């Protein structure tokens, strides 16, 4: 049995990945700001804000680390307030960095792997995405820096999704017209789901010959122009 630390295990991609790990017999230490409602003998849960959490309760060995929290804050650039830039950065980048600091010793002890999440909007310039693209760009920089610094002991990778059908994206997919428009923007003519992103993330956690990579799982949006 392997042990994974999943930040943001309560919903969306983090929850889907947690369920995959538990289903195959792994142990999960989950941390979220509210209860997940998941019940499993191999799941240990902590309820805290990652920006304030002291790291107590982590096991001495971690085979894997997942940081799944994110934000969707889309608007014209001139409309962003300083606190919105700050919030997006804290949720997406600073939280990941602080969690990784807490987990580093245990990851090194187990020769483990870390998984973060970026967005297609970092490499594919998109209107109204300035704040999230800036924050997730920091995540990609963190991935590559730590992959170099922690090699060969710990691998670090990220998945970069496009719009995914999760609770976080419900406002963007909340009616048929919006959902159809979002699907049409993708070469594969649909949006992804949390299970598809979770399986991609699991592949990066499991493959011992991948590090420092950002894998686009985006329905072809980043590279195809049909």
Protein language model regions, located:
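N-terminal Rossmann NAD(P)H-binding glycine-rich loop of SDR-like oxidoreductase domains
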Residues: 10, 14, 18-19
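Conserved NAD(P)H cofactor-binding loop of Rossmann-fold oxidoreductase domains
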Residues: 68-74, 220
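Substrate-binding pocket helix/loop in short-chain dehydrogenase/reductase
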Residues: 76-77, 81-86, 178, 182
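Catalytic loop of short-chain dehydrogenase/reductase
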Residues: 111-138, 143-151, 163-164
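Conserved Rossmann-fold SDR core element
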Residues: 140, 150-164, 210-217
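A glycine/serine/threonine-rich, flexible loop-to-helix segment
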Residues: 163-185, 225-226
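C-terminal substrate-recognition "lid" of short-chain dehydrogenase/reductases
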Residues: 190-217, 222
């Amino acid at each position: 049995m392997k042990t994974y630390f999943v930040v943001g295990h309560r919903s969306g991609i983090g929850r889907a990945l947690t369920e995959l790990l538990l289903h195959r017999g792994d142990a999960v230490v989950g941390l979220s700001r509210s209860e997940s409602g998941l019940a499993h003998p191999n799941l240990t849960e902590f309820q805290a804000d990652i920006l304030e959490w002291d790291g107590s309760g982590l096991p001495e060995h971690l085979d894997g680390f997942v940081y799944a929290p994110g934000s969707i804050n889309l608007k014209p650039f001139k409309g962003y307030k300083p606190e919105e830039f700050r919030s997006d950065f804290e949720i997406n980048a600073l939280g990941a960095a602080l969690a990784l600091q807490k987990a580093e010793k245990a990851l090194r002890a187990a020769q483990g792997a870390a998984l973060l999440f970026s967005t297609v909007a970092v490499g594919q310039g998109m209107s109204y995405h300035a704040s999230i693209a800036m924050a997730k760009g920091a995540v990609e920089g963190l991935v590559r820096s730590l992959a170099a610094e922690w090699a060969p002991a710990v691998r670090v990778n990220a998945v970069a999704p496009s719009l995914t059908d999760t609770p976080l994206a419900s406002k963007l997919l909340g009616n048929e017209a919006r959902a159809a428009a979002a699907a049409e923007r993708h070469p594969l003519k649909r949006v992804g789901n949390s299970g598809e992103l979770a399986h991609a993330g699991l592949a990066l956690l499991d493959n011992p010959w991948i590090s420092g990579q950002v894998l686009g799982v985006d329905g072809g949006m980043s590279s195809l122009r049909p």
